[in-house]
Amino acid sequence: MQLYRGMDIGTAKLPPGEWRGLPHHLFDVLDVTDEAAVARYQPEARRVVQEIRERGSTPILVGGSGLYVSSVVFDFRFPGTDTALRARLEAELAAQGPGTLFQRLLARDPEAAKRIGSSNGRRIVRALEVAELTGAAVSGALPEEPKPWVPVRVLGLAAPREELVQRLDARVERMWAEGLLAEVEGLIPLGIERSVTARRAIGYAQALAELTGELTRSQAQAQTQRLTRRYARRQLSWFKRYPGIHWLDYDDPQLVAAALARL
């Protein structure tokens, strides 16, 4: 979601003043009305990686979405799309919500359904589209033994579960304290309410619901905290599959040195 211009507080986007002179790439490249798609992100991110390598520097890919990170790091291939099929599935999503489509995906591809979750309508639609186009489970598109696209070292930050939950909940409260509602109010004239991807982002969807009176402040924050914890669990499950990942203690006083020692 850091691809989107104006979505800063809810995505914890690092402000330019904290870049320490190091170039950061693929921030603020989409309007909130644009649809984010991993199949488009992959070639753009790989182009940036190649350019950095050609300059003799080491690119650092930070994530985030497990699928987006993996699409760059590993040899992922993405099936095409079918406009009519996509339109039919999206019409079902709009009319019935994600629940019915999720049950269909659960019956067809339990692994993908578990990974995507029952509330991510857009990804459920894409998974069903791939399944109908290819006749194969979308989880089959995820390599069981990933082969790196380029030589790569993968580092992960590990934290005790109880402490992680506390920090995630506190972060959601900070989002509101730092002005998430005002940020979302500013995005409404830019079209976030009619967007396909941006309006469904965790935190932004709940802030919109609070602004329209669908949720109270406490309900919006509680829902955001619950979805954030669920997303974090999926992230951990995803990255645990990475071969050779090096887990580092997030609160190690020598964290930077420990990370550099692994490179």
Swiss-Prot record:
<comment type="similarity">
    <text>Belongs to the IPP transferase family.</text>
</comment>
<comment type="subunit">
    <text>Monomer.</text>
</comment>
<dbReference type="InterPro" id="IPR039657">
    <property type="entry name" value="Dimethylallyltransferase"/>
</dbReference>
<dbReference type="InterPro" id="IPR027417">
    <property type="entry name" value="P-loop_NTPase"/>
</dbReference>
<keyword id="KW-0808">Transferase</keyword>
<comment type="function">
    <text>Catalyzes the transfer of a dimethylallyl group onto the adenine at position 37 in tRNAs that read codons beginning with uridine, leading to the formation of N6-(dimethylallyl)adenosine (i(6)A).</text>
</comment>
<keyword id="KW-0819">tRNA processing</keyword>
<dbReference type="GO" id="GO:0005524">
    <property type="term" value="F:ATP binding"/>
</dbReference>
<dbReference type="GO" id="GO:0006400">
    <property type="term" value="P:tRNA modification"/>
</dbReference>
<dbReference type="GO" id="GO:0052381">
    <property type="term" value="F:tRNA dimethylallyltransferase activity"/>
</dbReference>
<dbReference type="InterPro" id="IPR018022">
    <property type="entry name" value="IPT"/>
</dbReference>
<keyword id="KW-0460">Magnesium</keyword>
<protein>
    <recommendedName>
        <fullName>tRNA dimethylallyltransferase</fullName>
        <ecNumber>2.5.1.75</ecNumber>
    </recommendedName>
</protein>
<feature type="site" description="Interaction with substrate tRNA">
    <location>
        <position position="86"/>
    </location>
</feature>
<keyword id="KW-0547">Nucleotide-binding</keyword>
<feature type="site" description="Interaction with substrate tRNA">
    <location>
        <position position="65"/>
    </location>
</feature>
<keyword id="KW-0067">ATP-binding</keyword>
<dbReference type="Pfam" id="PF01715">
    <property type="entry name" value="IPPT"/>
</dbReference>
